[in-house]
Curated annotation (Swiss-Prot):
Catalysis performed (reactions): 6-carboxyhexanoyl-[ACP] + L-alanine + H(+) = (8S)-8-amino-7-oxononanoate + holo-[ACP] + CO2
Binding site for pyridoxal 5'-phosphate: G105, Y106, S178, H206, T234
Necessary cofactors: pyridoxal 5'-phosphate
Subunit structure: Homodimer.
SUPFAM superfamilies: PLP-dependent transferases
Any one Gene Ontology molecular-function term assigned to this protein's record: pyridoxal phosphate binding
Enzyme Commission number, as recorded: 2.3.1.47
Keyword Cell membrane annotated: no
UniProt name for this protein: 8-amino-7-oxononanoate synthase
Pfam family, one: Aminotran_1_2
Superkingdom per UniProt: Bacteria
Binding-site residues, substrate: R18, H130, T353
NCBIfam families linked to this entry: bioF (TIGR00858)
Species the sequence originates in: Geotalea daltonii (strain DSM 22248 / JCM 15807 / FRC-32) (Geobacter daltonii)
Amino acid sequence: MQTFGEELESLRAAGLFRSMRLVEGEQSSRIILDGREVLLLCSNNYLGLADHPLLKEAAIRAVERFGVGSGAARLVSGNMELHFRLEERIAAFKGTEAALVFNSGYAANTGIISAIAGRGDLIFSDRLNHASIVDGALLSRAKVIRYSHNDMVALRRLLEENRSTSGRRIIVTDGVFSMDGDLAELAELAALKEEFGALLMVDDAHGTGVLGEHGRGSAELCGVMDRVDIHMGTLGKALGSFGAYAAASKEIIDYLVNRARSFIFSTSLPPAVLAASIAAFDLVDSQAGADLRKGLAANSTRFKDGLENAGFNTMGSETQIVPAFVGGAAETMKFSRKLLDQGIFVQGIRPPTVPVGSCRLRCTLMATHSQADVDRAVSAIAHVGRKLGVTGC
């Protein structure tokens, strides 16, 4: 049996060792990283709301009125007025009867999936779904059937083969796939769930606030808002705050209150976070929010086109998440370091986050990037790619 130290050395030798960098000050398009200003190209703060004055003001007012902490789990004494106000806001935003907030996206997915599925049930999960979906499915003890990425023919065959099951059939997918930036085939998934009597759950962590005419997410973009049974999303990405949610029928939300262990056994979100999240939804619903979405879309297109013109494989990206394929772990991390030398901070993505041989730079655009920022980033990536001999992968 290897010691912990030996396992860590194995990770270092394979180019898979991870460590944390220090970010000073606010999250914006430029940050102070380990004491140096850099252009940020790997944040999920897509609309730039994490340091928005309206969110900060809402958080400060909430602390002054409600204090810092919530004190307990919501089923004990930690259920506050702001929890209800935020959940009502989310339900209205998503067009559902009710909503429930969780402490993180990971807690939401593990809690929801392990609550709604169990022994005798079937979970159909896209192979590129987020790790929190994978872990939630494993915790549920249901039978998990993974289908090839966005392969609706394969999914139909699997549903047909398991049509006679007496348990629940649940289709779970990312709305936007977090490492490739492409979209789920939500219209086809909705049709399949209706044909086979399944439930459809969509993790829209990277679509909420960003996609669709009103920022409702990938389901709005695909025209299936009312055909998704459980909308899951996060408050800490485009919305600039913290936490996550499920939006669904009142029956499903009541069920989660009674069965989702990550909700039941967690101290509830604090007032500042709740108030900032409410302010974020208000902003997303405003003309200012529409302008931010428009700016983000323009930046994403400009960046993706620039990388592709430089010969990079952007792996089918359709969103603000734009990968630049590299291949090996060591090469990818060297690429990331060389970019940092030029003042561009973008993380290399390695196994187990992505399969062996598919390492990439996961670049993420923000509405607050200028055109000059975008062009500078493209130029730096193209330059380093040529020097390392990975352009055109």
